């Protein structure tokens, strides 16, 4: 009978040990599953962050390229000098000056904008020239500067050399033929204009 009881106790203990083993296995499995889930969540979070960073970098690169292209286009539109190496802020300031200059020219009605292409481009060259000379009178960034705005007659006395490899950068020279064909009073007037820094 004792043997029978002992075998019962032993088998009962085995069952207890087995149930403890089963529980510990289940706990280990659950821990492993939760660890796997955490690792999986961590990996997916890392992948999301990397993807988000890559997309943000692409957007920033595209924004920078668009901005640079816009500034490049603006530099081609505004008259510049061969010596200009303009930063972005200087380009914006120069564009603002050019807009102000054009506003004054339009207000005074100094340039006749004809519908003919040849006249339009001639007027555009004269405006570019006048702006560049106006810009060189005194301090480039001075607010209280009193600028001379050219009359159409003064603009007509100028000749332009456009250098294609420099975009819209103009190299200027005085209208020699205009000086040669003018009478002495006109020459004196042109020389005075040169001395005053208008051309």
Swiss-Prot record:
Distribution of this protein across tissues and organs: Expression is seen at the point of medusa formation in the ectodermal and endodermal bud tissues, and in the entocodon which gives rise to all smooth and striated muscle cells. After the subumbrellar plate differentiates from the endoderm, strong expression is detected until the medusa detaches from the gonzoid. Expression is observed in the distal part of the medusa but diminishes in entocodon-derived muscles as the tissues differentiate, with expression disappearing completely after stage 8.
Pfam family, one: HLH
Domain bHLH: 51-102
Region called Disordered, residue ranges: 1-43
Keywords per UniProt: Developmental protein, Differentiation, DNA-binding, Nucleus, Transcription, Transcription regulation
Record carries keyword Membrane: no
MF terms (GO), sorted A to Z: DNA-binding transcription factor activity, RNA polymerase II-specific; protein dimerization activity; RNA polymerase II transcription regulatory region sequence-specific DNA binding
A Gene Ontology BP annotation from the UniProt entry: cell differentiation
Bias kind Basic and acidic residues: ranges: 25-39
InterPro entries reported in the protein's UniProt record: bHLH_dom, E-box_TF_Regulators, HLH_DNA-bd_sf
SMART domains noted in UniProt: HLH
Main location per the UniProt record: nucleus
GO terms for cellular component: nucleus
Localization in the cell: Nucleus
Role according to the record: Probable transcription factor, which may be responsible for the formation of myoepithelial cells in early muscle development in larva and the formation of non-muscle tissues in later bud stages and mesoderm-like structures in the medusa.
Subunit and interaction comment: Efficient DNA binding requires dimerization with another bHLH protein. Homodimer.
Protein name, per record: Twist-related protein
Species assigned in the record: Podocoryna carnea
Upper lineage: Eukaryota, Metazoa, Cnidaria, Hydrozoa, Hydroidolina
